[in-house]
Swiss-Prot record:
Lineage of the species this protein comes from: Eukaryota, Viridiplantae, Streptophyta, Embryophyta, Tracheophyta
Protein name: Crossover junction endonuclease MUS81
Nuclease is among the record's keywords: yes
Subunit composition and interactions: Forms a heterodimer with EME1. Interacts with RAD54.
EC number(s) per entry: 3.1.22.-
Sequence motif Helix-hairpin-helix motif 1, residues: 62-81
Organism per entry: Oryza sativa subsp. japonica (Rice)
One GO term of the biological process aspect: resolution of meiotic recombination intermediates
């Protein structure tokens, strides 16, 4: 209910004329046709009440501007009728000695920066007003703003962080995105009233919100969204909103600092360029040479990074496929023809040997290579002939039509995926922001996958990407109770080649920050996952949307050439059945668990061993063939797989065959 324009007692006699001026302006606006909107009435009431209660004389507009609740909108309304009015509406600035040469600039209209918290709150409040809401309460507005994905930072407090002052004394610990509300109310863009507080956008706020939308090139998504066709991704590299990733690095400037991480983008196969993709730390960087095309804005890029996790666990044994794993498991036996050839493939066993210092630039250069593609998923040499491994698995091609004419790419989120109180809005938010279909299903593994749905037959094919999303707090608990290793093992065995591990939140304020950082490092470097890092929910939503566009672009580009030469994607039913079958414990699974108890035997090494020898009996039989040559027995596994180092090979031999 709008407050009544009634006269109040003025604390200072000198301010009676000013108070009367505000009151008369209020009454005159109420008498206009259509009256005065409730939120504007609250704004004028607050201004009038605080003018009446002022303890200092108000002699100019500058003095009036200092009164709490009086923003630029109120100043503009009173400018023509205020006694002794001044054209300068800006807050008074210091005129201390030494400020010579400064120009007395006029007032500058406040417009929030793009993707700032104020920007997101103002646009959200504007959209909700259009949808019929006259006001919003604090938590309701925070939830709606975070669900919009318009802010680069969280609006409400991050529950994964400790209380301010627990780990650092910086005043930044107290800041959240909601802190900008003070600025919005003081500038007259948002009106606040009642207890509990209710927030309403003013007319000035509406015009500012529209200006923000216009400057950002955004449509107003307040109206219902209708999608009639799949997105046009012919030039997606230039159209997508960029993903901004951060590494978890502590610096002297504060508990956490956002720095660069390896960034790659989907490459155009016709463009042969090799830019360097850097991984920056506080003082140094690792330069990855890969066949990728960077985005136009070097600070932000679309990321589908060079995961070394493309092995396909199919064929003879569900853990490791005989064909797809040959380059990494047993090149001397299964791929001897290529054993002496230098390629651009990234084999993570070669990682330590391929880093060379470049002292002149203070950086390190890594010769990147991967059995499967890195950024454009096709990093084999042009001379290498490999029907199945050159590109990712493709849906079947039944006509001469292009990919988007035959198929629709759909993002599938697990129904157990937890986004807190925002879960109900997550699907609509991704759908409205990125114009991509999103559905909820019960996934047997992972938190998100992408399917290609046949537009005529409605058959669903699972594309070669899967995401496991972890909040830093959940990641810490999963490490403690060993769910962490089991979940990663299930991801590796699911048959999809691009494994994305999405870590949400900042671990630095936590006691277990070092454990989380180590887990992220080993997951990416040693185990070949593509580890994506996001500061919070809003960035996670953008990551899902941008990955969907990038995946769509990749399949659109390679469908015409790769559909006849690559493997065929699993149908959704085949994928779920395969994952359900993996839950069954086999003799090889038990053998792998036993091997991982041996010193120096990693998960990758254990998988490599059982790929060669699925049971303990088969391994013992292989040792028996070399009986009498202890040196050869100790090196047998090392010679058959680059994933097994000399120490692990020797220790496994001692466990299985050596006496004593």
């Amino acid at each position: 209910m709008a407050p009544e324009a009634r006269q109040l007692k003025v604390h200072l006699r000198e301010n009676e004329a000013v108070a009367q001026c505000v009151l008369e302006k209020w009454r005159s606006m109420e008498e206009k046709p259509g009256g005065l909107k409730e939120n504007l009435a609250h704004t004028l009431y607050k201004s009038y009440r605080n003018v009446c209660a002022a303890k200092e004389p108000i002699r100019s507009l500058k003095d009036l501007y200092q009164i709490k609740g009086v923003g630029k909108w109120v100043i503009r309304q009173l400018k023509g009728s205020f006694p002794e009015s001044s054209p300068d509406l800006s807050p008074p600035e210091s005129n201390a000695a030494g400020e010579k040469g400064k120009k007395a600039g006029g007032s500058k209209r406040y417009v929030p920066q793009k993707n700032s918290a104020a920007y997101a709150i103002l646009i959200t409040l504007h959209r909700e007003t259009i949808n019929g809401k006259s006001h919003m309460k604090k938590q309701e507005l925070i939830d709606a703003t975070e669900a919009s994905g318009l802010s680069r930072s969280a609006i409400g407090p991050d529950k994964s962080k400790a209380k301010p002052g627990a780990f650092a004394s910086s005043q930044k610990d107290w800041y959240t995105g909601w802190s900008c509300m003070k600025t919005l109310t003081s500038k007259g863009l948002v009106a606040k009233s009642g207890n509990p507080a209710k927030y309403m956008i003013t007319e000035e706020g509406k015009s500012t919100a529209l200006e923000c939308l216009s400057r950002s090139g955004l449509d107003d998504h307040a109206a219902p969204l209708v999608i009639n066709s799949a997105p046009d991704t012919s030039n997606a590299s230039h159209k997508l909103n960029n993903i901004c990733m951060t590494s978890f690095v502590e610096t002297s400037s504060g508990p956490s600092r956002a720095i660069g991480r390896p960034k790659t983008s989907i490459a155009n196969p016709a463009t042969k360029t090799s830019p360097e993709v850097t991984y920056l730390t506080s003082q140094e960087s690792l330069n990855y040479n890969s066949d990728v095309r960077t985005a136009e804005n070097c600070a932000e890029e679309i990321i589908l990074s060079d995961s070394d996790s493309e092995e396909l666990y199919t064929e003879n044994y569900p853990l490791i496929g005989s064909e797809e794993f040959t380059e990494r498991v047993a090149p001397p036996i299964l791929n001897a023809s290529n054993s002496g050839k230098t390629t651009t493939n990234y084999r993570f066993s070669d990682c330590s040997a391929s880093i060379s210092p470049r002292s002149s630039e203070g950086t390190f250069e890594m010769q990147s290579s991967s059995t499967m593609g890195i950024a454009e998923f096709n990093m084999l040499d042009n001379d290498t002939v490999c029907m199945d491994n050159s590109i990712l698995a493709m849906p079947p091609r039944r006509s001469s039509k292009n990919f988007l004419e035959d198929y629709e790419v759909v993002l599938i989120l697990d129904d157990r995926e937890n986004f807190g109180g925002r879960s109900r809005k997550t699907v609509d938010n991704i759908h409205s922001q990125f114009r991509v279909p999103v559905e909820i299903k019960h996934l047997p593994v992972g938190d998100g996958i992408w399917i290609a749905r046949d537009r005529k037959l409605h058959t669903e094919y699972v594309l070669d990407f899967i995401v496991e999303r972890k909040n830093v707090a959940d990641l810490c608990s999963s490490i403690t109770d060993n769910r962490y290793k089991d979940q990663k093992l299930r991801l590796k065995k699911c048959g999809l080649r691009k494994l994305i591990y999405l870590v949400e939140g900042d671990p630095n304020p936590l006691d277990t920050s070092e454990r989380i950082k180590t887990a992220c490092f080993t997951t990416e470097i040693l185990e070949g996952f593509d580890v994506q890092r996001t500061p919070g929910y809003a960035e996670t939503v953008r990551t899902y949307g941008n990955l969907t566009h990038s995946i769509t672009e990749y399949y659109s580009t390679h469908f015409s050439t790769g559909a006849n030469t690559s493997q065929v994607c699993l149908t959704y039913d085949e994928f779920t059945k395969k994952c359900d079958d993996l839950k069954k414990i086999t003799v090889s699974d038990v053998f792998a668990l036993q091997l991982m108890q041996v010193p120096q035997v990693t998960e990758e090494a254990a998988l490599a061993v059982i790929g060669l020898y699925p049971t303990l009996f088969s391994l013992a039989k292989a040792y028996s063939m070399l009986d009498g040559d202890t040196h050869a027995q100790e090196k047998m596994l090392k010679n058959k797989s680059t994933l097994i180092n000399a120490g692990a090979s020797r220790n496994i031999f001692k466990l299985v065959w050596a006496e004593g």
